[in-house]
């Protein structure tokens, strides 16, 4: 007699295929079902993971390009997906998920290996992802595929508050000045971490009106920038939180000024607080946020593929959010 496991392993998912914008409802369903089941296994019964804002999905899909991959079942329904991103030599995966009824049959390994292969083929030198640190199953699963645990990423929030003067915003510049600002952001980033490039994310955020990039200058020279989203993360929610996706500060002494510029922008844009996802390697930045009144909200475990480690900025602070 066939068992449930026999039935699962007998099925074959077709993929990877490129993600289409019309796939967003299907992606949302798989995302919600998979992570709701993950919380249930962790003892958080009754938690239902909501759908993400379709505009955020569009950003993730267009940012990833051909790195956005889906696998389909016999009825063409989405049964798994992996969204692999690269920013110059920095590569990471997320979100990625498999429908609960398709798990335990090897599909999870297939989609992760596809993401690894795509990132390696696109000359990334960093291949990483994040997972919940309390979830031993996930950590063991990724470790079996060659990922090594790194430090925690800690999410902290600061309340929005007015500042003395608003920072310059990329979205309000002329087309020519935007080109110049992009070049400055690239130069600043690569002066701290060679090969990193957040130009595409800056331009896409502007094109989709999801947020903006703050440009902090001293005597006309760019000393910091912060790419952030103000659009709600969850479908149907109001604007509550400004999320910092990328942040580069030339010197730790300028970190607080950049944070205060973000707090001011949050107030001006109608959001209640600013969320920073701080990699554990930047302990001084973490301590500064706590001293400013930052509240710890969440933790994630950062993991990188063996042979593809994540570097720390040689000077200054470079924060890179590995979630959308």
Task: List each model region and its residues.
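Active-site rim helix/loop that mediates acceptor-substrate recognition in acyltransferases
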Residues: 3-7, 29-83, 193-215
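Amide-forming acyltransferase catalytic core, primarily the GNAT-like/NAT-type
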Residues: 27, 124, 144-243
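Conserved beta-strand in the GNAT
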Residues: 68-70, 76-85, 92-97, 215, ...
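Conserved active-site alpha-helix within GNAT-family acetyltransferase domains
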Residues: 105, 109, 121-126, 133-152, ...
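Conserved N-terminal entry element of GNAT/NAT acetyltransferase domains
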Residues: 1-22, 159-178
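Conserved acetyl-CoA binding element of GNAT-fold acetyltransferases
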Residues: 89-101, 237-251
């Amino acid at each position: 007699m066939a068992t449930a496991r026999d039935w699962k392993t007998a099925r074959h998912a077709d993929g990877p295929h490129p993600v289409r914008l019309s796939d967003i409802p299907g992606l949302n369903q798989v995302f919600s079902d998979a992570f709701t089941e993950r919380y249930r296994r962790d003892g958080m019964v009754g938690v239902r993971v909501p759908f993400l804002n379709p505009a955020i999905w569009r950003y993730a899909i267009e940012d990833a390009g051909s790195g956005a991959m889906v696998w389909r079942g016999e009825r063409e329904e989405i049964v798994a997906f992996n969204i692999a991103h690269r920013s110059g030599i920095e590569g990471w995966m997320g979100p990625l998920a498999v429908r609960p009824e398709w798990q335990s049959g090897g599909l999870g390994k297939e989609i992760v290996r596809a993401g690894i292969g795509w990132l390696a083929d696109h000359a990334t030198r960093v291949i990483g992802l994040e997972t919940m640190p309390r979830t031993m199953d996930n950590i063991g699963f990724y470790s079996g595929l060659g990922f090594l645990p790194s430090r925690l990423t800690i999410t902290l929030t600061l309340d929005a508050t007015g500042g003395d003067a608003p920072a310059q915003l990329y979205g309000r510049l002329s087309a020519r000045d935007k080109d110049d600002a992009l070049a400055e952001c690239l130069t600043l980033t690569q002066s701290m971490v060679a090969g990193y490039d957040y130009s595409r994310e800056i331009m896409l955020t502007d094109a989709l009106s999801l947020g903006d990039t703050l440009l902090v200058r001293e005597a006309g020279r760019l000393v910091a920038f912060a790419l952030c989203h103000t659009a709600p993360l969850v479908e149907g929610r109001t604007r509550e939180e400004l999320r910092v996706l990328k942040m580069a500060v030339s010197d730790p002494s300028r970190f607080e000024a950049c944070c205060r510029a973000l707090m001011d922008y949050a107030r001006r844009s109608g959001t209640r607080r600013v969320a920073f996802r701080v990699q554990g390697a930047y302990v001084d930045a973490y301590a500064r946020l706590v001293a400013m009144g930052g509240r710890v909200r969440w933790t994630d475990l950062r993991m990188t593929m063996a042979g593809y480690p994540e570097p720390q900025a040689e000077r200054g602070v470079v924060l890179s959010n590995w979630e959308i």
